[in-house]
UniProtKB/Swiss-Prot annotation:
Belongs to the class-II aminoacyl-tRNA synthetase family. ProS type 1 subfamily. GO terms for biological process: prolyl-tRNA aminoacylation. This is Proline--tRNA ligase. It comes from the Bacteria. It comes from Tropheryma whipplei (strain TW08/27) (Whipple's bacillus). InterPro entries: aa-tRNA-synt_IIb, aa-tRNA-synth_II, aa-tRNA-synth_II/BPL/LPL, Anticodon-bd, Anticodon-bd_dom_sf, Pro-tRNA-ligase_IIa, Pro-tRNA-synth_IIa_bac-type, Pro-tRNA-Synthase_IIa_type1. Gene3D superfamilies: Anticodon-binding domain (3.40.50.800), Bira Bifunctional Protein, Domain 2 (3.30.930.10), YbaK/aminoacyl-tRNA synthetase-associated domain (3.90.960.10). Keywords: Aminoacyl-tRNA synthetase, ATP-binding, Cytoplasm, Ligase, Nucleotide-binding, Protein biosynthesis. GO terms for cellular component: cytosol. Consists of three domains: the N-terminal catalytic domain, the editing domain and the C-terminal anticodon-binding domain.
Amino acid sequence: MITKVSDFLFRTFREDPATTESRGYGFLLRAGYIRQTGSGIFSWMPLGLKVRHKIENIIRYEMRQVNAIEVLFPALFSADLFKQSGRWSEYGDDIFRLKDRRQGDYLLAPTHEEAFTQMMKEICTSYRDLPRTVYQIQDKYRDELRPRAGLLRSREFSMKDAYSFDLDEKGLRQSYEAQKRAYKKIFDRLEIDYVIVKANAGAMGGSVSEEFLHPTEMGDDTFVVTADGSAFNAEVYVTLPGPAIDYSNAPEAEDCETPGVISIPDLVNHMNSSGRFIGRVIESSDCLKCLLFRIEYAEVQNGNPGNLVVKKILERGFEYIGFLVPGDRNVDLKRAQVALSPLTIEPADNRVFECNPSFVRGSIGPGLSGVFYCADPRVSSGSSWIIGANRPGVHRIGAIAGRDFSFDCTLDVSSIKTGDKSEWGPVTVKRGIEIGHLFQLGLKYSNALGLKVLDKDGYNKAVFMGSYGIGVSRLFALIAEKNCDERGLKWPAVLAPFDLHVVLLSSARAELIDSLTDCGLDVLVDDRRVSPGVKFTDAQLIGVPKIIVIGDKTRGEDVEVWDRANDQRTVLPLKEMIQGVIQRSDTGGCTERCTGVCPTR
């Protein structure tokens, strides 16, 4: 098929928009693959849709290989099912809520567990109806507080979400492993790097969860890799607790004047210059800082949060939470939010300090009224610290945990660093972006929504569920980010919007294009009346892997072939070049080319 640029909905831009946060995102906007229409909201243009559909069709192909059945649900839902499952409250401000003219509650679905469960409840009545795996590719909606990086974190995004339904846990594990194998094939075919990490189920619920993360410094997910090759999302990583220490002979804690000290570096410098520690250098890790957060109470399902720490906070009505962490650490907010779900927390701002005179900035420590204290696992009984004394310009030296100060609970929410010790040895900390997530949901939604079938003995039995998601629009953005240089995009052949990009420089040789009509390839022909420089610049920006130059420098059937991947240029007869492209396409693992169900078309 031949598409002429003069007949195409197409425009490129020479400069990145001011809001561009990454090179690949900038090229997607400049080349006209997508257009931003609002904060975290994008329109898909013809070039972008062609690539997106190829990603979707690869996913569809691999889903068919594991007998998954495609359906399509609406994005708009009544809140009834979400209230029944408990997620109407669990999601808090992260979902778009709205009311109809009768004041009924609705939402734009962030995921579709409830809808799939209800559908299967109405269709499946017997064990003979199981197992089943059903999926859709649909837009989702989340009210991101700070949308960023284009399609990587947007308010509207495309996902493939699949759900398995089995009679028992063994069947659930088999369905889970089948999806996991399919995901590996999908990401391998898309040529995207990934690491499989153990993860937290979060608001999705369930017991077993794994993420597919694409390693990149752009990522907002932290994961750790252990010496034996195991990988964990930071949210589920377990810090080794410090050893209990006998403090029966430890000296008494002392108050120390620390005028002007408001940070850990200030405190370390002051201590090392005070002359109190002869022969010893004080490090940040010798100090215990208290990071103060304001607690925001969310509606808790049935008054029971299912989280003992949160239950304590609710029962005693605390307004603030103080995290006691070593001075060389910070609070990992994602770990903290997971540990305290369904509560949300916000760092204490100036207003908090203005309303609470006892909160002394720079010298906050244990013992404040109205604060629920959570200590890092390293704060073991008998460990000695330099802490804030809750008085201006005063800290305490040699404060012993369990003797001089106490806390309400131990909570593992500190930041993790490369070299930290784990039960598997030292860890390496990396960053990544989630591209896929697998959950063994178990009976959470089946029990909540009454999904049961009759077993062989005629008894009603709750159905075991699994949930499996892939971020389609996020994959699109990441693949663009990975496959670009300073001049533009460089799509893998399996995903490129066209097989060939013809730069027509000589109208006298335009008849060569006729030989491309029936070759079975998708061809973009730049027939615009613009300068060769503009055409070449746009060809590099768009990123089709093979650029064919038809001009006066070649004769007869010869054309110049420009390989966008390595920038090599060769002169070949047009038919030979076409045959080479077709052969490479036909040996790429696809056995259904030109049958109408090709996973890349």
